[in-house]
Amino acid sequence: MSANWKTTGKTTGELSFEISQDEIKKSLDKAFGRVKKSLRVPGFRKGHVSRVIFNQYYGEEALYEDALNFALPEAYSAAVKETGIKAVGQPQIVPVSMGKNKAWEMKAIVTVEPEVELGQYTEIEVPKQNTRVYQKDIDAELTKRQEQNAEMVLKNDKAENGDTVTIDYVGTVDGVEFDGGSAQNYSLELGSNTFIPGFEDQLVGHGAGEEVDVVVTFPEDYGAKDLAGKEAHFATKIHEVKAKQLPELDDEFAKDVDDSVETLDELKEKIKAELKSEKEEAAKAAIQEAAITTAVKNATVEEIPDVMIQEDVDNQLNQYLGDMQRQGIDPQTYFKLTNTTEDQLRSQLSANAAERVKTNLVLEAIVAKEGFEASKEEIDAEIKDLADNYNMSEKAVRNALSDEMLAHDINVRKAMDLITDSAKQVAKAKLEEGSEEDK
């Protein structure tokens, strides 16, 4: 194939290429095979017209459009590969010449990825992370586990934040009851902020047997539009008040909450190890984010084409909705419950799309510069991990994702690891001093 690339802008150009006579013949055969079944020519049974007779009646040119549709995808892909351009989006392809017994000449208006000039991406200075576990961290986790295993006991005193009250309530707006505004024997933890702002606060200081007229105003962005911004009265009766009774911190408690330990000291050591692991993971994530952000900032990227930004938003949206469905959540039900729309979600995803695209371009440029290449073993391991994570068969993963796509993800992770692992943690003061010098 003879292909030629001519740059016409920072991210646009013209790709000239040919479709060979051999490929044209194959595509004409496919096109004839498709139309033959429905052909009607006087003197011939339907679907039994020869190619010669077809050409006599209609001319071979009648097959050109279908033949071109068959031939173009492969010919265009081959031209892109031959010229080495990084095409994005859909090209605008225009036939230049389509004659008999010669190659067909094509011209495509193509958008390509912008050029990337890398800056420093290794040994980047990032804020030092503290992964030390303090006694207060362990104590807080123990308290959390006490609360999770607390018993609820009746109290005769007035309700306080943290107590749970059992109530009946009837809500009205302008003296009229509304749907969903009434309940009986409802358990509500005061301070949980599960009800309309102000509702729970007005029950604090009241005890069992009391009736309280709770007056609140629905938020302006409340899901039910007919109630948004309106004042409501809730005739509320408190049946009982219960308080949390925390279990004693002793060896028995330790064994109750974790059957892998025998004593409270062992539980504390296990909690310390778990918190240490969590802090180290959080530290690595923070280092990675800071280092990659700086590496991207250090790079120079030409103007990003709109088509790349829209493709990113489409991919993010499809992934978001796909994750919902895999969790058994119907997207339309989700939008209804959250009082949002797909367009609003798309708008949210668009906010950082350009930065996401720039980050991907920089990471891909690092992959190319470092010469990262995923091995067959790495691709096989990636397929196994994806199959396990999404509860799919490995065959299904292979059918859904090409080796090229999998290798791309593996290599990008290698670039991210290179940036992260080579980063240097320094004190915040030193970083601020360096930023002052850069001004």
UniProtKB/Swiss-Prot annotation:
PROSITE patterns in alphabetical order: FKBP_PPIASE
PPIase FKBP-type domain segment(s): 162-247
One function term, GO molecular function aspect: protein folding chaperone
SUPFAM superfamilies documented for this protein: FKBP-like (SSF54534), Triger factor/SurA peptide-binding domain-like (SSF109998), Trigger factor ribosome-binding domain (SSF102735)
EC number of the protein: 5.2.1.8
Catalytic activities: [protein]-peptidylproline (omega=180) = [protein]-peptidylproline (omega=0)
An example Gene Ontology biological process: protein transport
GO cellular component: cytoplasm
Superkingdom, natural source: Bacteria
Record-linked Pfam families: FKBP_C (PF00254), Trigger_C (PF05698), Trigger_N (PF05697)
Entry keywords, A to Z: Cell cycle, Cell division, Chaperone, Cytoplasm, Isomerase, Rotamase
Domain notes: Consists of 3 domains; the N-terminus binds the ribosome, the middle domain has PPIase activity, while the C-terminus has intrinsic chaperone activity on its own.
Family in the record: Belongs to the FKBP-type PPIase family. Tig subfamily.
Name recorded for this polypeptide: Trigger factor
Originating organism: Lactobacillus delbrueckii subsp. bulgaricus (strain ATCC 11842 / DSM 20081 / BCRC 10696 / JCM 1002 / NBRC 13953 / NCIMB 11778 / NCTC 12712 / WDCM 00102 / Lb 14)
Biological classification of the source: Bacteria, Bacillati, Bacillota, Bacilli, Lactobacillales
